[in-house]
Amino acid sequence: MPAPFDYIDIGQVVGLGMARIETAVLETFIAAFTPGWTADRGAPDAMVYAIWARLDAVASTDWPQTKRLGVDALRWVRNPPVGETLRGRMTVMAKDPVGEGKGIVIAQHDLLDEEGRLVFSCLTRSLFSR
């Protein structure tokens, strides 16, 4: 789990948890948010993003992260099928102090499938307290 800004190391890798693609959840998501998509194509991109966002939100609840400044460089590599378990991880790429009480942490976030293949990736910029 990340620490205050000054104790976060570049290259540090943090697990964000796991989530399984469940049939009922996939069907409900498709009906609500991606009309025209079919479940046989796997989880739609929007659902993959939502899974990452949930894993990130739960994992970072107790972090000294005070604000998410941006999410960019989003990449979807594949649409995981029903039954697939995805694993989230965050890798600290860079950090920059901005004043006495805070600093910006730039991190790459990945969702990997059960075989360790990349499913989704993005970069984040977050403010952490020092």
Segments from the language model and where they lie:
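HotDog/MaoC-like acyl-thioester-processing domains
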Residues: 1-9, 80-130
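Generic structural detector for well-ordered beta-strands
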Residues: 15-20, 75, 125-127
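Short, surface-exposed, charged/polar-biased interaction segments
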Residues: 32-37, 73, 111, 130
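Short helix-to-loop capping/linker segments positioned immediately adjacent to catalytic or ligand/cofactor-binding
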Residues: 37-41, 76, 96-98
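Mid-chain, well-packed structural core segment of small domains
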Residues: 62-91
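Hot-dog-fold acyl-thioester-processing enzymes
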Residues: 1-70
